[in-house]
Amino acid sequence: MTAFELTRRDALAGLAASTALPFLSSPAFAQATAADAQANALLDSIAENLLRFYPQTATSLGIDKDARAAMRAQLDDRSGLTQQRIAQTLRADLARANAIDVAGLSHSTRTSVEVVRSAYTTALEGFRLPYGDVPVGSWRNTPYVVIQNVGAYLDIPRFLDSEHQIATAADAEAYLARLADFPQQLDNETGRVMMARYKGLIPPAFLIDKALTQLQASAKSAREGGGLVESIERRTREKNIPGNWAARARAIAQKEVAPALERQIAELTLQRGMAKNDPGMWAQPSGDEYYRWALKASTTTTLSPDEIHNIGREELRALQGRMDPILRSLGYTNGTVGERMQALGKDSRYKFAPGDKGRAEIMAFIQERVRIIRTKLPQMFNTLVKGNLEVRRLPPEEEPGAPGAYGGAGSIDGTIPGKFWINLRTTELHTKFDLPDLTHHEAIPGHVWQGEYANKLPLIRTLLSFGAYSEGWALYAQQLADEFGVYDDFPAGRLGYLQGLAFRACRLVVDTGLHSKRWTREQGVRFFVDENGSKAEEVASEVDRYCSWPGQACGYKIGHTAINRERDKAKAALGARYDIKAYNDAVVLGGNVPMDVLAKNVDDYVARTRA
């Protein structure tokens, strides 16, 4: 890890001293061999080569300091030329990773090598496609560089406000430097959107409409100063940092950011006149090829669209079979499971108040559910992390195109907490029976919790992730909450959990339906409403998300099923020696991996337990 290694060692030492957690004694952190040291030095070099393209990630991880201090004033370069440079770097570093002899390596180091090989191979396949964004080792592969839930216009304002910390005048100067680069990154993406148009790629009209609404709101905010100015003004005032920060930020926002947003609006307005309403990749040039790759990237498997579609229908039937008796016990006896879940969703006992009163209720409700689940964690894991968590509302201008919530871990050193972002555009999006499950998925023991373990791994492992693992773990986290009793006195909450799993089974059906079976957008929405009792307003945004992130929705249930399959295998192999806490440690300490590597990690856990 070169310059990064001392920082991580200090962080781990501080963690161990302050919390007395058994992290460093884990097999995942066993003493490295000489061969490991050589391999890890190469992997550290590969990590640094990747990180230099993503200075925003360095800030989010809290490692934009010392040798990387210049990154603190930089944004990710979103130009087409830089995409080519990333691909060139991946090709060279994949060759280096492939040349490592894994025979003499420890299991943990061998896992890191396999992770790099898998992530880089898949990313390079994506870069060979004629369009789209290919975030390396990430979950947001998309054919559309700017759309309702993708683009610098969304990412950078949120990043500047929530990830770029301001404690000194130098931090404020770095904020302004990044803000000054924002227009260039908008133009870089506008140029790539134009190039995609020349290749025949036009997003569906209904997605462009959403994107234009949000872009127009962003442009209006920039012309007025808005959040880009308020963020630095508020935080420099709170820290008593003298300077004309607000005036400088306002000049950039009004004179540079707003015109760049207007240029992006003009391009998408042009494309709106050419757009159709076909939602799936089947309607796009090279769309079938793109979708096959997107499924592989999301699931880390070679399952076909038809296979995934059928898995979704089978798992949905099984989950509805578990929901039916609970619904009957609550007095909901008439109609399909989906119809009865719709009725449950209208039950006033489970609704939040409208408006700001209900928004406050939701935030308090989440905090209470986090408190409850924290008491269960020592029963689930031998190795614990802090679970550094902040619950925040999504920026209102982002909410119309966003899902109900999302979350992720904070910085390596803990200075930036993990975030649970909740969409509160209307309190009708959430109920008291489904919000606990959402909290377990996004926060603890889901994304925020798992991400903290990943932050203790070598840097390359922190940078690379796989949707099937990330989302599969988050679903497994929901399952653990149920298995450890959080719904024992709350049957409606258990229904919310099962509905959440069924929702992910529906995703397998709808995603493949849209992109492979030529479903309409309306068919996708109706499937969720009819089969799972989902709220039409919520799933309309969900279906739009599947249209802009093809394949991404399939990683969830495929990953969850794989984690349970490996658990069943470990139980059968170990018998009385099987321990749920040890199994959970093996999965989460093994880090974010493709599903075939997960199986190897579980095999290693079984072998160690038998020894």
Label every model-predicted segment.
Residues 2-22:
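N-terminal secretory signal peptides and thylakoid transit peptides that target proteins
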Residues 29-611:
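N-terminal maturation segment of proteins
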